[in-house]
């Protein structure tokens, strides 16, 4: 009886239409339903860090789901704000600058590898670079090195000649 009362008050969530995404025997491969449900796989994949739309699509393709199912899952995740390439690109650029001391050229290259659109990359880089003191990052990165070594290290980390 308690279970029915609980279900009566449940709000609609992104999990409510799971039966729209059929899991066929070819996808099952002996695993439990939880591990073969495309929505569950996508949610577990984005659980630990933000992902680009392409990364999630690629993950679902590797799991063996058809394009129609992948499209439905991606649409649902975008509608619920769980996938947002603009937000992803900004956070990736900001973290790469502040935590990993990567320069704009390297960040741009890595985001292109993740199939983020060029205009989104440029906006994210502008925003991240405006919020970070790049000279401070360069100082930390090249502390105690002679001029030749500084220049080499800056190029390796993705800072161009203008720094």
Regions from the PLM with identified roles:
Residues 1-163:
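An alpha-helical, amphipathic repeat domain used for nucleic-acid recognition
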